[in-house]
């Protein structure tokens, strides 16, 4: 049976991992064994946080909408319920943007929600 020399393959794999670990502190960017662990953990964090990012942004939008709605004398839940009844289909991302950048338009939406609830 022929002898298999894997020097090229191993070097390529090491090089790939060390390239991914570039910018890490200390041994994590220089020592292959430590770099593999660091890159693996970084991948796990990235996977988890891509999902958490969606939740966190929704949380932020809701907090902003709630603050703006309360400035106009209405709670968040009643505001959203009023918009649904008024058949206004604007998502929370856009509502939060309107709440921050266009107070008059948001006030009009609050009035529409109040009208639908009355």
UniProtKB/Swiss-Prot annotation:
One term of GO molecular function: rRNA binding
Keyword Metal-binding assigned: no
GO biological process, one term: translation
Coiled coil (residue ranges): none
GO cellular component: ribonucleoprotein complex; ribosome
Keyword DNA repair: no
Keywords: Ribonucleoprotein, Ribosomal protein, RNA-binding, rRNA-binding
Xref: Pfam families: Ribosomal_L20 (PF00453)
Protein family according to the UniProt entry: Belongs to the bacterial ribosomal protein bL20 family.
NCBIfam families according to UniProt: rplT_bact
Known role: Binds directly to 23S ribosomal RNA and is necessary for the in vitro assembly process of the 50S ribosomal subunit. It is not involved in the protein synthesizing functions of that subunit.
Name under which the protein is recorded: Large ribosomal subunit protein bL20
Natural source organism: Pseudoalteromonas atlantica (strain T6c / ATCC BAA-1087)
Gene that encodes the chain: rplT
């Amino acid at each position: 049976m022929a002898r298999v020399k894997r020097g090229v393959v191993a070097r390529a794999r090491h090089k790939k991992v060390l390239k991914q670990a570039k910018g890490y502190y200390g041994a994590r960017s220089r020592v292959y064994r430590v770099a593999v662990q660091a890159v693996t953990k970084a991948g796990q964090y990235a996977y988890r946080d891509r999902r958490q990012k969606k939740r966190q942004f929704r949380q932020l939008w809701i907090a902003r909408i709630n603050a703006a709605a309360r400035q106009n004398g209405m709670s968040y839940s009643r505001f959203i319920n009023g918009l649904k009844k008024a058949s206004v289909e604007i998502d929370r991302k856009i509502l939060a943007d309107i709440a921050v950048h266009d107070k008059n338009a948001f006030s009009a939406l609050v009035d529409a929600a109040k009208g639908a609830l009355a």
